């Protein structure tokens, strides 16, 4: 698949275009231009390194939304075996913007749950652009309860702009479904490992992200609102999204510094979409390390650790009036 370049990557796109032209010429010519191709390839690689070393929060947001970025089911195919998808919330419907099911990770049975976007127009519409309705969160709760019953560790993958704000979703109890998931995940008697793989949008993300370990891919985001939404509220214009992204502190490095996540997983040069298999290999190691951390830990110790982790969120300082 031909790589889609973002606006800020146009210098790289131009170089890659020249490289492709030279490769096409070389295939139909007796002239050896391999050295020139190699020179331009090294130049493109260095340019990518330089560009990605100084990304703004808004540019990171664009990478997190890249249309070729691996989604949950892509990682399921690379990281897990014997995946058997489970459907429905047993109350209303099956929301396919959240996928989940039984699988094996390194031979160990587990439960996998994650947001799922679409690749083309038809699939994006079917999966509601990765924005779950209440039945999606209730399906996730059902699968988490099932995992707890059989003592299976839970892996969740976050990639959503946010919970769907439509009238039907609100009528069916969107906020209740999200709130219940927060409560349930805080009390579950089994390990939960969460990875933000793309967008982590507000409560829609948090509803499957109350975990014992929360990791983020290097160029993913996690925030209470999208930059465009924040800009529309504060500045009455979505054009201020770059400034909003800066103010939100939505990047992995900023959130790690604040103690809101536990680990950052580096991405291949140019982002996960440039090397999905390489990204999957890095993610596999991180998930295995996290799972080993909780193996052998008692249920009481696990829940106590989770509670302490949640209670450590946020810092404040008390002052005496007039001091």
Swiss-Prot record:
Localization per Swiss-Prot or TrEMBL: Cytoplasm
SUPFAM superfamilies tied to this protein: ClpP/crotonase
GO MF terms, alphabetically ordered: acetyl-CoA carboxylase activity; ATP binding; carboxyl- or carbamoyltransferase activity
Keywords: ATP-binding, Cytoplasm, Fatty acid biosynthesis, Fatty acid metabolism, Lipid biosynthesis, Lipid metabolism, Nucleotide-binding, Transferase
EC number(s) given by UniProt: 2.1.3.15
Chief site of localization: cytoplasm
Pathway: Lipid metabolism; malonyl-CoA biosynthesis; malonyl-CoA from acetyl-CoA: step 1/1
Record PROSITE patterns: COA_CT_CTER
InterPro entries referenced in this protein's UniProt entry, alphabetically: Acetyl_CoA_COase_a_su (IPR001095), ClpP/crotonase-like_dom_sf (IPR029045), COA_CT_C (IPR011763)
GO biological process: fatty acid biosynthetic process; malonyl-CoA biosynthetic process
Catalytically driven reaction(s): N(6)-carboxybiotinyl-L-lysyl-[protein] + acetyl-CoA = N(6)-biotinyl-L-lysyl-[protein] + malonyl-CoA
GO CC annotations on file: acetyl-CoA carboxylase complex
Stretches assigned to the CoA carboxyltransferase C-terminal domain: 39-293
Broad enzyme group: transferase
Gene3D superfamilies from the UniProt entry: 2-enoyl-CoA Hydratase, Chain A, domain 1
Complex and partners: Acetyl-CoA carboxylase is a heterohexamer composed of biotin carboxyl carrier protein (AccB), biotin carboxylase (AccC) and two subunits each of ACCase subunit alpha (AccA) and ACCase subunit beta (AccD).
Protein task: Component of the acetyl coenzyme A carboxylase (ACC) complex. First, biotin carboxylase catalyzes the carboxylation of biotin on its carrier protein (BCCP) and then the CO(2) group is transferred by the carboxyltransferase to acetyl-CoA to form malonyl-CoA.
Similarity comment: Belongs to the AccA family.
Protein name stated in the entry: Acetyl-coenzyme A carboxylase carboxyl transferase subunit alpha
